[in-house]
Regions:
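Feature 926 captures the class I aminoacyl-tRNA synthetase adenylation module centered on the KMSKS loop
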Residues: 1-358
Length: 358
């Protein structure tokens, strides 16, 4: 795409393609999902692979952007490479422009990852609509399975999806399930030029489409409607498919993808959500106090009975996430106080004593 844009003397299109890949695919997806791989203690094979992939992406990006961002691209290239390395030049402008290697493209993996991205986006949009923060865990999502290929793709990225949207379980629904009921609405603007005088008859026929008919339209992208003056082929893009909400759930539809999210919150989920909010608050305090990423810390806290129960239930998780050696309750009005989900909590952080000083 970038090479073709430059060949067409269209640097704007090339720059936008680079920006989209860097922002959406690399930063907002790969880097964010690989954070735990980067943070692993020892340089094991998986951690090395994560860094190697990121390095290769950044190196190629520096070369792709060189014609439109000569100074920054050269700084990035020099920061990543060493002239002493084999095949590495002193400047990005002395290196060869990258050549696409289509033999390395794994189309099945790309399509599988697209399913993951689309489903995550749909679930997160429901959270936003319902004003449920992402740090608040939810119990389950349901996804109708169109075919065996889709099932296998979903299984491949199930754990990734659940982690990204902070949901406990993913339930697979067969397409003939009676849990999710879909309705079809015609897109008159898209359909009008082609339907003409048949519009009223098409509208009447569309009202009587069954769940099986709607599934066929989703899977095949079209469906034949038998009208009085002959068949009319209704296209998926000329319709809008909606799903009826289930009590306690919210449903989203995007093309042939449907997902239902259980938005019911119980005490256990609320407790875990508050623990995650506390971790976020402690991480921000670590940063504000200038602690290093690897520093071990000591936490002192004060809270009412409700939040004390949260800390007691999730102390191990909290300590592991923020690198705390101790998390101790105290009674000191000099702590930093703030609210979490309407509950008042006080905190104080300090560096944990090193083993040599114990």
């Amino acid at each position: 795409t970038v090479t073709q844009a430059f060949d067409d003397y269209d640097p704007t299109r090339a720059a936008r393609a680079i920006e989209d890949f860097t922002s959406e695919q690399l930063s907002n997806w790969y880097v964010r999902l690989s954070r735990r791989r980067f943070w692993k203690g020892e340089m094991q094979e998986d951690k090395q692979a994560a860094y190697d992939t990121l390095f290769e992406c950044l190196r190629v990006i520096s070369q792709l952007m060189a014609p439109v961002s000569p100074f920054f691209s050269d700084w990035l290239y020099r920061s990543l490479t060493s002239p002493a390395s084999a095949g590495i030049t002193d400047s990005v402008h002395l290196s060869n422009f990258p050549v696409s290697q289509p033999q390395n493209i794994d189309s099945e993996l790309e399509e599988t990852m697209q399913v993951a991205q689309d489903l995550c986006s749909m679930v997160l949009s429901i959270r936003k609509k319902e004003k449920i923060r992402v740090r608040q865990p939810l119990s389950r999502i349901m996804v109708p399975i169109a075919n065996e290929q889709f099932r296998q793709r979903l299984k491949h990225v199930e754990s990734l999806i659940l982690s990204e949207v902070n949901v406990k379980e993913l339930h697979y629904l067969e397409e003939d399930n009676e849990v999710l009921v879909k309705t079809l609405r015609l897109n008159f603007k898209a359909l009008g030029p082609r339907a003409g005088a048949q519009m009223k008859a098409i509208q009447e026929k569309a009202k009587h489409l069954t769940q099986a008919d709607i599934r066929k339209l989703e899977q095949e992208g079209k469906i034949a409607l038998q009208l009085a003056d002959g068949d009319f082929e209704l296209m998926l893009g000329e319709t809008e498919i909606l799903a009826q909400d289930i009590p306690g759930w919210q449903v989203a539809v995007n093309g042939n993808l449907t997902v239902a999210l259980d938005i019911t919150l119980n005490d256990a989920l609320l407790s875990e959500g508050r623990a995650r909010d506390l971790v976020n608050r402690i991480q921000n305090m670590r940063k504000d106090q200038g602690f290093q990423v690897t520093d071990r810390i000591r936490i002192e806290w004060q809270a009412d009975e409700a939040f004390a129960a949260v800390i007691a239930a999730h102390a191990d998780y909290i300590c592991a996430e923020v690198l705390a050696e101790e998390i101790l309750q105290c009674d000191d009005p000099a702590l930093d106080f703030f609210d979490i989900d309407g509950l008042r909590v006080g905190l104080r952080l300090a560096l944990a004593p090193s083993p040599a000083t114990n």
